[in-house]
A protein has these predicted regions:
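Residues within membrane-spanning alpha-helices of integral membrane proteins
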Residues: 3-4
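N-terminal helix-rich module
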Residues: 7, 11-45, 49-135
Length: 135
């Protein structure tokens, strides 16, 4: 009997969908925030502009400083709100950090049924924060 239960478990467990849990979603948001903070700090240290690339349809965020990428699972909906123009050029799905620490700002929302998180970049200070989305 125990062998039959083990066999059924081995067959059925891979079929059960593995949705992203709320704690895992929060961990992804913190990971995105740390990537953005790294890009901001690198812009200050190098005295140069650094652009963080955001590809919402592909659920991919890439550091302009290191090339490190955060790829989000298929069940996470990624949406962004960034400035249409940043400085003298179209933003093109990026958040730009300047040598002063300032940025063009933006919000990256990571959501799934039941809630989510926003990673907010302040345009004036370039500071990054993670805020829970209350359903």
């Amino acid at each position: 009997m125990l062998a039959i239960i083990a066999l059924l478990a081995a067959i059925l467990l891979p079929v059960i969908p593995h949705a992203t849990s709320r704690p895992r979603l929060e961990a992804y948001a913190v990971d995105v925030a740390s990537l953005l903070t790294l890009d901001r700090n690198t812009a200050i240290r190098r005295h140069a502009q650094i652009r963080t690339q955001i590809d919402a349809p592909s659920r991919l965020i890439a550091s302009g400083a290191t090339g490190r990428q955060v790829r989000l699972p298929d069940d996470v909906v990624v949406s962004t709100m960034v400035a249409a123009r940043c400085g003298d050029r179209p933003s093109g799905g990026t958040i730009t950090f300047f040598a002063s620490g300032m940025s063009c700002g933006g919000v990256i929302a990571l959501a799934r049924p039941g809630g989510g998180f926003q990673v907010r970049v302040n345009w004036l200070t370039g500071g990054v924060e993670v805020v829970a989305i209350v359903p």
